[in-house]
Amino acid sequence: MLRKILALFAIIISISLNINAQDLKLLDAKDAVTGASRMDLYLPCLKNKVVGVVANQSSIMDNGTHLVDTLLSKGVNIVKIFTPEHGFRGTAAAGEHVASGVDDKTGIVIVSLYGKNKKPTAEQLQGIDILLFDLQDVGCRFYTYISTMTYVMEAAAENGISVIVLDRPNPNGFYVDGPVLEPENKSFVGMHCVPIVYGLTIGEYAMMVNGERWLTDGIQCDLTVIPLGNYDRNAIYKLPVKPSPNLPNWESVYLYPSLCLFEGTDVGVGRGTKLPFQIYTLPQLNDTVNLVGYAHRYRNNEQKLNLSWILDARKRLQNDEKFFNTYFIKLVGVSDLQQKINSGLTEDEIRSSWQTGIDNYLKIREKYLIY
């Protein structure tokens, strides 16, 4: 009888686990219809308007053509292209200066929004009626496209210009995790008090920034979001174009939120190799940890920020007084995480300190979910 009871109990547990487990699919981005490709929803808004476009190499239509080329073929009057970190063609490395200039293919003036000029000026916006924003985000607070979007929205609000955000899949949109940024640690790699992984598409994020009045002085812009079609939030999306030079595939995008924490240490993350953000290297020990297989094995289970790698690296390099650099606090957004890691706290102990902030954020996030 006891064996039967235990067997029945095991079946109940198994069923419960299967019900609660999230089926995380790996999909091609083409399985969702991007906002850019839903031209019937926004082309009428551009008729007889002077248009500026915020775009880069990821701003492609579902048929593979570039947004700017497509709009020009439809007769849209694009007078200026604004481009973020990595440049209009997406070839500049992280942190590399992005110069303004003229696009060789179209002859349209390109204005860089990375470097000293992160926010469009009134002069640069003069004569523009509508700003069309179309960048592929990866759902991570320190990925700077959402910061560029914030400055674009702010400049638009100050100059009476409408903003249309063309939504795209968030390849890390299936979870929310990480410490919520403290106001005193705001920077271009973290402008808002949200967790590291915030679980919103870039269109939803724009709505949150506007709705919560996070622009300077609480101003709001005239914002329209063109939603995705056939979007599944509970999926990893294989993007057709890499969003930036060092995120070449879905594995790097999936691992990026966790591995980017190493950018605030003296541990390498594979920049300049064939596996950027898929490995980490401890040069002092001449050791490299390859996580490509991890991404494939655990993508259905590890729907969280993984701290075990940085905790392990710190333990192995416990005598390295320069393990952390000053950039670490900017990345993580909180002042005490470095101390917690140095003191030997476990991942669970550290994670528990985030929960109240995450719970409060989830209440805000819920108001802006489209999908």
Predicted regions and their residues:
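Glycine/threonine-rich flexible loop motifs
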Residues: 137-149
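Conserved functional hotspot residues or short segments at active or partner-binding sites
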Residues: 276, 281-355
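N-terminal phosphate-binding or glycine-rich loops at protein starts, especially the Walker A/P-loop
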Residues: 31-76
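Bacterial Sec-dependent N-terminal signal peptides
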Residues: 1-25
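Glycine-rich, charge-decorated loop segments at or immediately adjacent to ligand/cofactor-binding or catalytic sites
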Residues: 90-95, 164-186
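Conserved anion/nucleotide-ligand pocket segment
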Residues: 186-258
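Glycine-rich oxoanion-binding loops at beta->alpha junctions
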Residues: 98-128
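Short internal beta-strands
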Residues: 79-86, 166
